[in-house]
A protein has these predicted regions:
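Transmembrane alpha-helical segments of polytopic membrane transport and secretion proteins
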Residues: 1-23, 270-289
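Short cytoplasmic-facing helical segments at TM-TM junctions of multi-pass membrane proteins
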Residues: 169-208
Length: 289
């Protein structure tokens, strides 16, 4: 319990530092705009390119479309919520696939030697080229009455980016137990499944938690980029493109969508932080290092 409280306390301190960093960025933003009026800078600091911080926040209350009852804030909140569902769906699929691959590669050495190079090579494919390919293939797929949609393509791309760090981290964690512990389990006639669940998985937690964080971040990035690439509507990625078209008349509006994407990432990070506390609450401090 004390270990959990200590981790929560450290998390609170980290949050305060993060808030201080946000305030510092806002101050530097405004100082840069002021400096741009005094001397010539190598980039544009006009209100068209760099709106004031208060202009960005006032854009939250603007109607999304002239005459509409829906505010920009409501539209961004709905889009971020939709993207969150897609990102978490892709993240879950990526975690399951990554864990299965890690277990198979740990259990069978020839699979590790054969699969690992392909797992690594899979991440060298440019996402911008992969998205249209997945959409094109997906349009030919149907499961009875269920037709593949671009929503599934977005989740697939998110899972594609999420599975790699999880599979590598899980594989390293499953291989972490020292030979003495493995020999002790085998001396008790423990089966491979017993060793997996009672020794390898607990030993892999310090490796799994960082891998989960990277996978979650990759799933969010994959979701936003896939929404832009595939043109799926309703998500924060597509909303940023739509608001970017209005930069001439409302330059601050696009930043509201960017704030929505940032908030999406922070929510996912908070979810993973809660999972982190849950998984590591009983680990000794040495295991958390």
């Amino acid at each position: 319990m004390s270990n959990t409280r200590e981790r929560i306390s450290r998390g609170g301190i980290s949050l305060l530092w993060a808030l201080a960093g946000i305030v510092l960025i806002a101050i530097m933003w405004e100082l840069t705009k002021i400096l741009g009026t005094l001397i010539e800078l190598p980039f544009n600091t006009s209100d068209q390119a760099m709106p004031n911080i208060w202009s960005m926040f006032s854009a939250f209350t603007l109607p999304e479309v002239r005459g509409s009852d829906t505010s920009v804030f409501q539209a961004v909140l709905a889009a971020a919520s939709y993207s969150l569902l897609l990102a978490m769906g892709g993240f879950f699929i990526g975690v399951v696939v990554g864990l299965i691959l890690a277990i198979v590669m740990q259990r069978f050495l020839f699979f590790e030697r054969g699969l690992l190079p392909f797992v690594i090579a899979s991440q060298t494919v440019p996402l911008i080229a992969l998205a249209p390919l997945i959409v094109g293939i997906g349009n030919q797929i149907s499961f009875g009455p269920i037709q593949w949609s671009t929503t599934y393509s977005v989740m697939f791309i998110a899972a594609y980016l999420a599975f790699f760090p999880l599979s590598i981290g899980a594989l390293r964690g499953l291989q972490a137990p020292d030979p003495t512990s493995l020999e002790l389990m085998r001396s008790y006639a423990a089966t491979n499944n017993s060793i997996l669940w009672k020794l390898r998985f607990p030993a892999s937690i310090p490796y799994l938690v960082p891998a989960l964080k990277v996978s979650a971040a990759a799933a969010v990035v994959g979701t936003v980029v896939a929404e832009i690439s595939t043109g799926v509507r309703g998500g924060i990625g597509r909303l940023m493109i739509e608001y970017a078209r209005e930069t001439t008349s409302q330059p601050a509006k696009v930043y509201v969508a960017v704030f929505g994407a940032i908030a999406l990432g922070l929510v996912v990070a908070a979810i993973i932080a809660a999972i982190d506390v849950l998984l590591t609450r009983n680990l000794p401090k040495k295991g958390l290092a």
